[in-house]
Amino acid sequence: MYALITDGSIAKYLSGNRGIQVGDIKYARDIYSKWTEAKRNAIGIYEVIQNDTKKKDEKYYINTDQTFTYDADAGTVTATYGDATAKAHADTTWTQDEIDAGKAPAGADTDTVAAEGLKTIRIRLVKQQAANILKNTDWYIVRKADANTAIPSAITTFRAAVRTKCAAMETAITNASNTPAIETLYTYVNTADEGDPVVVERPLGEFPELGS
C-alpha cells in the first residue's frame, strides 16, 4: 500500500497495482516494482509502513480502524491502530429498555441471550471438535448394537478419553475470568526448561489421538 503526498498531507491511498498521474505526468504501474523508494518519494509517493504494535488477534478483540500519519521530517507514512476492544467473554442479554423499544425478538425477556460471548462460542466449538473425533469410531457402537460384536478396549478407552478431555476444556473455558484469560488458553508457548528441546503447548491442551 502506498500514499500520495500533496502539499504536505496525504492526498490519496494507492494499491500499487495500477498507473497514476501526478500533476501533469502519467506514470506506469511499474514504478512500484522498478523504481527505488527514494525515486518514488521524489514525486510524492510513499510506501505505507504498517505499525501493528496495538493490533490484536481478531478472534478475541475488535481492532480500531488504522490512522495514517505523514511525517515530513522522517519522510514516512505510517498506519497505526488504536487500543483494541476485547470481545465480550460472557453472553449479553436483552435489557428491559431494549425490549420496550422493540429491539428484541418477540417473547424475549431479560434472561434471553442477545449476543453470545466467547465462552459460549468456544465451548460450542470444543463440543463440535469432540463430536467430529468420536464420529470416526461411531461405527463400532453401531456394530455392537446391530451384531453384538465386542468393541475393542482401545476404542472404548479412546472415546472415554475424548469425552473427559472435552469436559476439562469446557471447564477451563468456563473458569476463564475475562477475554485475555480465554486467549491465553489457546496461546501456544514453549513449556520446556531452558536448554531442553522445544515443547510447544497451549494451556487448554489437545484432544487425544487414537493409538497415542
Positions of predicted regions on the chain:
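A preference for well-ordered globular domain cores
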Residues: 1-212
